Regions:
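Hydrophobic, small-residue-rich transmembrane alpha-helices and their short perimembrane loops
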Residues: 2-240
Length: 240
């Protein structure tokens, strides 16, 4: 590896670490803010319990699927041949090809788990900080002349936390794989990208189902218990 490549890898790792440190700083700043009145916290606790129950149920469902897919991904290297750079690294003879297939299969499966794990961390922590920041945004709008600016700042920090965490973990994972595999990294990075995007898709679909169920439940409560028509603005759940 040439000097310029080593320098650029070092810079990328520093950028990844800086993103993670910035995300931690944003989270710490949000959690240090007041959570509002007792009544606000009572409502917020219900939202928080619902979000955490969804995250825990999602985790129990996803982990077995990831285990099966990681094993299947190992055997994909025997269906499609490794890249040219991989063969240059391990050799183009039968022994080299067999070694390349085995090493790439291992790397692809491990990278898949790594990408899925990073995506899971982002989803879990991102959801939690979103719940934590919501009540603090509501509290910020209740006091002071600059309340809307402060509320917007809290919203920005809560959302940016997830973005910085995604960037930092993505850069860090991709760079580590590149350092280990060198010119054979594209074959292993396939698993890393697939793990991250596949888990994000699962979480996106699962979150949509969960929120739709909450929406239907809120409509039923408004109709049955309060006698309100569907999508009535007097139902707070409709506004939410």
């Amino acid at each position: 590896m040439e000097l310029i490549e080593q320098v650029m890898i070092f810079v990328v790792i520093l950028a990844a670490i800086a993103s993670l440190v910035y995300a931690w700083w944003l989270r710490k700043g949000v959690l240090a803010l007041p959570k509002g009145t007792e009544q606000m916290q009572k409502v917020w606790n219900g939202i928080r319990e619902g979000a955490l129950s969804y995250l825990n149920r999602q985790l129990k469902t996803i982990i077995p699927i990831l285990a099966v897919l990681s094993v299947l991904l190992f055997f994909t290297v025997y269906i499609t041949h490794p890249e040219r750079g991989t063969l240059e690294l391990f050799g183009n003879d039968p022994t080299g090809i067999a070694t390349a297939q085995f090493m790439v299969g291992i790397g692809r499966s491990v990278a898949f788990i790594l990408g899925a794990g990073f995506s899971l961390i982002v989803g879990q922590l991102g959801m939690r900080i979103a719940v934590e920041s919501n009540i603090r945004v509501a509290q910020a709008t209740r006091e002071g002349e600059d309340r809307y600016n402060r509320a917007l700042t809290i919203s920005y920090r809560g959302g940016t936390f997830t973005g910085m965490l995604t960037d930092g973990l993505g850069l860090l994972g991709g760079t580590v794989i590149f350092i280990i595999y060198g010119i054979a990294a594209p074959d292993a990075l396939l698993g890393f990208g697939l793990g991250g995007t596949l888990l994000a898709l699962f979480m996106r679909v699962g979150g949509g189902i969960y929120t739709k169920a909450a929406d239907v439940g809120a409509d039923l409560v408004g109709k049955v218990e309060q006698g309100l028509p569907e999508d009535d603005p007097r139902n707070a759940a409709v506004v939410a």
